[in-house]
Amino acid sequence: LTAAALFLLPLAALAQGPVVGPATCEAERAVYEMTAPDTDDVWRIGLVPARNMASIASDLYLKLTTPRRDYWFTFSVSQGYAGISVFPVTDPYAEGGPRDLLGSPFGANPNGVTDPDILNALRFLTLDAELNIAFEPPMSGEEAPPYIMLPEIGRALWYDAAALTDDETADRDPMPRGVFRRTQCLVAPHPQAGP
């Protein structure tokens, strides 16, 4: 390689875009990852297809995998300017399917969490390559966005991890703030979940 070729190599790498893997990928096959600069730990998001609609907003479950455990969510879309939220549920692969972990009016669990601080931490954003934010959650068969953000979920995992899982041993689960980047596209989607 010549010196000029070595100089141009980083520019060519930037021109390819920030997403690793195929240029196109269906939402249910996408894998998203985020790392922290001071650790080798990886936080992952997968979008798992539901046998039926996971919620009125999407036919996908969101699975957040931290170095400590898995958390499962369904999507909710508010009218107006409120945007997209994720609501915690139990593992949809478990016998009997998922159960809401939130109380009324956001979930059907009579003993579920109703703390507004937790609810405010459950925002969900998808961003395209130009960093435009989508107004609807991902759906099966649609193009997977290159980026996902859960901007305040780290706060909920730190202070209220037990509210986001049915794991009774759940305690503080540290997670950095950042953006999940699409890093792979599975050959086949996750098996369908839910009842």
Language-model features: locations:
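N-terminal signal peptide c-region/cleavage motif recognized by signal peptidases
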Residues: 10-12
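N-terminal secretory signal peptides
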Residues: 16-109
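Bacterial N-terminal signal peptides that target proteins for export
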Residues: 1-4
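Surface-exposed, polar helix/loop patches in the mature regions of secreted/periplasmic/lumenal proteins
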Residues: 81-148
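Glycine-rich, aromatic-bearing surface loops/beta-hairpins
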Residues: 122-195
